[in-house]
Amino acid sequence: VLIIAVLFLTACQLTTAETSSRGKQKHRALRSTDKNSRMSKRCTPPGGYCYHPDPCCSQVCNFPRKHCL
């Protein structure tokens, strides 16, 4: 009976450890995505002023009027 109780408690601990490690992995992935979004370059939406550091999101700039298409 004691052996069965020890095996049951060990199985419960392993299951709990797997569940909590999955939660941490998901959290790390979210943190990584947030970091990547901050590091990505900005782009100017259509109708906005186009200039070199922040190119147009559409990749098309009307240079005479200097706005993104």
From Swiss-Prot:
GO terms for cellular component: extracellular region. It holds the Pfam family Conotoxin. Transmembrane segments: none annotated. GO terms for molecular function: ion channel inhibitor activity; toxin activity. Expressed by the venom duct. InterPro entries: Conotoxin. Residues 1-17 form the signal peptide. Residues 20-41 are annotated as: Disordered. Keywords: Cleavage on pair of basic residues, Disulfide bond, Knottin, Secreted, Signal, Toxin. Residues 18-40 form a propeptide. The presence of a 'disulfide through disulfide knot' structurally defines this protein as a knottin. The cysteine framework is VI/VII (C-C-CC-C-C). Belongs to the conotoxin O1 superfamily. This is Conotoxin AbVIF. It comes from Conus abbreviatus (Abbreviated cone). The lineage of its organism: Eukaryota, Metazoa, Spiralia, Lophotrochozoa, Mollusca.
